Amino acid sequence: MVVTNSCAPDPRVLRSAFWLSEAGHQVTVHAFDRLQLHAKSESLHGARIMRYHLGDIPYGGMLKSIRGIMQFSKRVKATLLHSPPELIYCHDADTLSIAVSLKKSHGIPFVFDMHDLHHTWIRMPAPKSILRKLLSRKMESTMIRHAGKADAIITTSGKIEGGIHDGFEQYLQSKNLASIVVENRPIEMSIPQQRNPENKDWTVGYLGRVRELKTFTLMLEAIKLIPTTERPKLIIAGDGIRENEVRELMLNAIESDGIEADVSGAFTPDQFQELVKQLDVMFAIYPPERGNILQGALPVKMFDAAANGVPSVVNSGCLMGEIAEAEEIGKAVAWNDAQAACDALLELRNKTVELTITSQREKEKFLSTVLPLID
């Protein structure tokens, strides 16, 4: 398996590695530790994680990131050539060039797992930038060409039965690429605690990658519409390219508006469990300008929160909102509507939800797709 993050952790990568290991296969995850923060070698969930340290290459720097990924790809390719695997599993589009090259030279089959529309990420810092728009189109074209060479394609979302909103499966279909949907549903479920309707102390959280400032600006706008004595505490946890800006935004809100907030960085799976148990509502509303939200992105935090009984506020007018309301695990509201977000938070504050569709369904689809390529 190849992934361009440090896999410390990456739940989808580790879940797929665990399923293959459980099925009797040896799995090595080749991960790019850009900030060189984690052990170079680690065993986790039955898989070996090899982390490549290639100098400090921070997230967000476009040219540095491109050069770093090219260097990482070259190193991984050399490692795999030294001891060729039976199968290469590509997590996201920025790892495809490795598998395409080795399939051409050594006939090694590969799976493309499209977590997200990777070409939309480059537009995140400046959605109106013409240069970033052109680069995004080039990345998309390359991804489609490489994906066509895959022996199987797996993705994270698809239109639900009787639904109206498309997912990534439909995006791939529009490019004449067939795929299997394996959603990011957690393996472990917690027994949810019933909320106390008389309890005035409550907490709203955001746990995950901190990629966009606008999500947190909207969160604060919604919270400020709640009377001061009834406002929730905020818990923000996660790392990403906007981490420092979000921290500063929250510190200003604490000082100027009396908002109560805890802000922290990256967390482990165990720490996530401790954090999510403190929440009453998960905030998972994203700016739709970059494209992947309206095309079917499903926030992992929505499923992880529901597995712990916590409802989420998510975007309306897209697949995530449709699933949240169909499965009764959250409330969908329009982007940039602070009043609607405020109303949804208040509506959900004492609600306990249950995630009835778990990863078992996803595991069966995953194994039926991947195992025929190696067994």
PLM regions with names:
Residues 1-37, 42, 152, 158, ...:
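N-terminal subdomain of nucleotide-sugar transferases
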Residues 74-81, 97, 101-105, 118-119, ...:
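Membrane-proximal helix-turn-helix segments that form the acceptor-binding/catalytic region
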Residues 137-179, 186-188:
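A short, active-site helix/loop in glycosyltransferases that binds the activated sugar's phosphate group
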Residues 154, 186-188, 196-224, 235:
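Conserved donor-binding/catalytic core segment of Leloir-type glycosyltransferases
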Residues 247-276, 281:
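Nucleotide-activated donor-binding/catalytic signature segment of Leloir-type glycosyltransferases, i.e.
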Residues 281-284, 304-314:
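Short hydrophobic beta-strand element within catalytic cores of glycosyltransferases
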Residues 326-327, 331-338, 346-349:
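Conserved acidic donor-binding segment of nucleotide-sugar-dependent glycosyltransferases
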Residues 336-340, 349-375:
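A charged, aromatic-enriched C-terminal amphipathic alpha-helix characteristic of glycosyltransferases
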